[in-house]
C-alpha cells in the first residue's frame, strides 16, 4: 500500500479513497490539510464540504484544527507570517495572481466558517432529516433523546410484570437478566438476534420473545411520545436513501461534493449504508481511520464494515510519519509490532518513520524507551510452572509501579528540556479493580494520582445523599426521613449529635428541608445546592478526607438533576424516581462518569478506552499481559460477515458452544487491538509487566511477545500454557536482542524520597500592561437599546422574557376607523404573556386540520412555564380562541395577500437563532470603530423622505444610542422567516404590545409610532441583515433584490381575522416595511468592515 502524500493530487469527485492511519500519524492534521487545499486550489467552498467524526469532543477538535489551518495559511499568503510547514509552502507556490486567488478563497472560507458542516454522524443525520422534512420521513416535533435507557427500563418493568408477575415458580428470566437483555438489543439495532429458531418453550425462546416484545413496545411508545433515539436518525435516513429516485439522495449529493469521514474504523453497518447510498460514486468520499485501533465493537463499531468499505475503495493509502513518539521508541515498538496481524489478514501493523529523531526523556534512572519488567515466581514464593494468583500480583505490581514512578520523579529526569512531573505519566489498564490498586499504591507512596473511570457517579455516596434529601423533601413530616437526611453531607450530623439534640435537631432540619424544597420548586435543584453551600456544606465536606471527591460528585449530581428536571419537566417526586432509576441502572452514558476532583498535577490512571486519542511522555502498562476470558449471557459475534447477537442464554447446547468459540476469537482480536492502542500512547517511554498467571495465555502483550518470535507476523489467539520463568525469559531476551523491549526483573527496591530541598525563589510584583478592549462584547438588539441608558460591559446578552416588547406603547393620538374589538382584549399583557404567545406561535402547525385544537394543545404545553394572570382551566381555550383570528388576517401586499394559515410549516423557518460576527468579531487585531451612529448615517442616506421610518435615522444619531459600539458578536433569534411564492423571504416578528382594545388602535399610523417609540426599526434592520447573510450561503443564485421581501411586524392584538379593516393596503395589526436592498447590503458590509479589513 502506497503512502499518502498530502501535497499530491487531490481525490476526485466520484471516487472513494481510504487513508489508513497508524497511532500518532496525524489523522486530524491530514484532514485539516485536505480541507485547506480543496478550498485554496479548487472552486469548492466550505458549505460544499461535509466532515464527519464519531463523538462531540472530536468534532470540536476537528473544527478548531481546520479553522486554525486556514488561519495559518491566510497569514502566510498575506505575508503576515512565515510558512510553518510543507503544506503552507505548497500553497505559496505559483504566480501572484494564483496566490491572490488562494488568499481570497481562504478568506471567504473564514468569513463563512459557520457554513462548514463538521459534526458527529448523528448530528449530521439529524440536520439532514430536519432539512429534508417529508422527504426524510421526519416529523418536526419529534424530540431527540440522547439516551433511551429510562424508557427501556419502564418497558421492561411493564413487560416483566405482564409475563412473569403471576408465575408461582421462579421465572425463566430474572429481572436483571431481562433489563440487560433489553438494553443490549436496543443498543445494537444492526445485529441479527440469534438463535433464529429456538425450540418452543425453551429458555432461549422466552428470551427472544421478551426481546421482541420490548422492541415492539419501544417503537409504539416512541411514536406516542414523539421521541426518537440516535439510532433512529440513522435508520430513517438510510430508509430515505433507499429508493432509486430518492429525493434525499439528490439533495445530499447536490449540497456536499466533498465528504471526509474521520475515525472510520468505528463505523457500523447502518452508518456506512447512509454514506455509501448518499455519496459513493458521486462525491469525493475520503475515509480516514486506523483499523488497528478498532476497539469499540461493544458500542456498535464494526471492523467488518470498515474492511468491506475499504475493499471497495478506488484508492488506499497509509499515513507513514509518526508525529508522537521518539524514534527510539518507534523502532523498539516496531520490532514487536511490525507486520503483526491484529485479528484479520488486512489489519496489519505497517512501518512508520518517526518525526522526533532524538530521545526527549533524559536522565531517567532506566532510560530504555520500551521496558518489560518480568515478575519471577520466586519473588512471591512460587516455583516451577505454578500460576501466581492475580490477587497477589494486584499487590506486587502496583507497589513496583509506585516505586518506579517515585524513582523517576526523584531522579531529576527531564522531558523535552523540562523536569518530569507526575502529570507526564499515565497508567493504562483495562479493569477498574486494576486501576484502583494502582491508585492506592501511588497514594501510599505519596504520589498524587487521579482515576475518574472507576464508577458511575450515580453509584457514589453523593448520589445516595441526594436521593435521601429528595425523599425527605417529599415527606418532611416523617422524622425517620428527616433524621436520615440530617446524616447526609448536606447537614453533616452524626448519630451522636442526633442522640444528644433529639427532637430539637429534627425540627430544625425539617424546617430547612421545607425551605430548600420551596427553593427547588421555584428556582430548580441548583438553588438547593447553592443554599446548602451558603449553609456551610462546602467548608464542612472539604475539611474531611476525600472531601474534594465528595463535593465534586455532589455538584455533578446537582447538574444532572437540574438537566433532567428541565428536559423531562419533572417535579420533586419525579426527580426522586428518576435518580432512583439511574442508581439502579448502573453504568450509563459518558456524562455519568465521575469527574476529576482536582486539577493538581497528578499521575493519570485511565482505561484504554479513555486513553485512545491521548498521548503522554511516559506510559505504564501494569496488567496488559493478563486477560480473563469469560462467557456472558449475551454474545456478540459475526457469522459470515453478518453481525449477530446471541441472546439465547447459557443453556443453548452445541449451538451455544459454537457461538462461544466465535465470540472468544473476536474478543481475542479486540484485545490485540486494545494492546496496540495502549502501547502507542507514549511519546518517550513505555513500561510494561509480565507475570506467570493463569490468564496470561490470553493477554494481548503475552501473545505478542511470548506467543511468537521476532519476524513472525501471525499472533496466536492463545499462548502455550505453563512455561517456566527461564523459558519465558529466554523468549523475551530474543526480542531484546532484536531491538524490542529491555527486559528487567520486577523486584521492589527502596522507594526514593520525593522530598528534595527546593530553593525559594524571590518574588516580585507582576504588572499588567495590556489594554482591555471594553467595546468588544457579545450583545443583542435588546442590549443595544438598553445600553443607551447605561453602558456596561457584559459577557452574555440578557436572558429571560420578551425584552423587546413594552406593555403599552406611547402614541400621539387615538386611532380612527372600524371599532372591531381585539380578540385579545380580555387577556392580560406583559412580558410573561408575550413569551407564552410566542412559544405557542412558534410550535403550532398552521396547517393542522383543527387549528383551534392545535393552538389549545400548544397553550397547554407551554402554559406551565409562564405565569399568566388568567384562571388556569380557562387559559388554554380562551387564548386559543383569541389567536385563531390572526391566522386568517390578510398579511397585505408584501405577503401576496396570503394569511398565516396559508403558509405551511415547510415554508417557515421558526426561531432562527443567530450569532453574527460584527467588526472585530472573529479575527484578532484592531479593527475600525463602528457604532450605531454609523448605522443612522446609512439610514439617512438610503431612505427616501416619505419612508415611514426615515425619522429613526435621527434617533440613531442621538447621544447614548448612537454611541453604542458594534464590536464583537450580535446574538438573537428571529421569530419566523416566511418563504413566499417566487422564493421571496419575509422576516416576521410577533408583537403582543397593548395599543388599545379595537382594531382601530392598530392602524398603520399608530403602528408606525409604536415602531419608532420602541426602537423596532433597529431590530428590523439587524434581522434583515441576518437573513441576507443566511440566504447568501443557503439560497442558490441568491440575489438580494429578488429574494429579500422585507419585514412584517405582526401586532397580534390588532389582527381580527378576515374582517380586519384595511387602510391604504395596510391591514390593521400588520406593519410592513421593505428597506431598500442597497441599505441592507451596505449595512451588512458596514458591520463586517473590521473583519474584511483585518
Curated annotation (Swiss-Prot):
SUPFAM superfamilies registered for this protein in UniProt: P-loop containing nucleoside triphosphate hydrolases (SSF52540), Restriction endonuclease-like (SSF52980)
Keyword field: ATP-binding, DNA damage, DNA repair, DNA-binding, Exonuclease, Helicase, Hydrolase, Isomerase, Magnesium, Metal-binding, Nuclease, Nucleotide-binding
Reaction(s) the record says it catalyses: Exonucleolytic cleavage (in the presence of ATP) in either 5'- to 3'- or 3'- to 5'-direction to yield 5'-phosphooligonucleotides; Couples ATP hydrolysis with the unwinding of duplex DNA by translocating in the 3'-5' direction; ATP + H2O = ADP + phosphate + H(+)
Gene Ontology CC terms, in alphabetical order: cytosol; exodeoxyribonuclease V complex; peptidoglycan-based cell wall; plasma membrane
Active site per UniProt: 989 (for nuclease activity)
InterPro entries: DNA_helicase_UvrD-like_C (IPR014017), DNA_helicase_UvrD/REP (IPR000212), P-loop_NTPase (IPR027417), PDDEXK-like_dom_sf (IPR011604), PDDEXK_AddAB-type (IPR038726), RecB (IPR004586), Restrct_endonuc-II-like (IPR011335), UvrD-like_ATP-bd (IPR014016)
UniProt-annotated binding residues for Mg(2+): 838, 975, 989
Residues covered by the UvrD-like helicase C-terminal domain: 357-613
A GO molecular-function descriptor: 3'-5' DNA helicase activity
Residues in UvrD-like helicase ATP-binding domain copies: 1-326
Binding site for ATP: 21-28
Cofactor binding note from Swiss-Prot or TrEMBL: Binds 1 Mg(2+) ion per subunit.
Chain segments carrying region Nuclease activity, interacts with RecD and RecA: 775-1094
Superkingdom to which the source organism belongs: Bacteria
EC id: 3.1.11.5, 5.6.2.4
Subunit structure: Heterotrimer of RecB, RecC and RecD. All subunits contribute to DNA-binding. Interacts with RecA. Co-immunoprecipitates with DarG in the presence and absence of darT.
Protein family: Belongs to the helicase family. UvrD subfamily.
Purpose: A helicase/nuclease that prepares dsDNA breaks (DSB) for recombinational DNA repair. Binds to DSBs and unwinds DNA via a highly rapid and processive ATP-dependent bidirectional helicase activity. In the holoenzyme this subunit contributes ATPase, 3'-5' helicase, exonuclease activity and loads RecA onto ssDNA. Unlike the case in E.coli, suppresses RecA-dependent homologous recombination, is instead required for single-strand annealing pathway repair of DSB.
Record protein name field: RecBCD enzyme subunit RecB
Gene source species: Mycobacterium tuberculosis (strain ATCC 25618 / H37Rv)
Lineage, opening ranks: Bacteria, Bacillati, Actinomycetota, Actinomycetes, Mycobacteriales
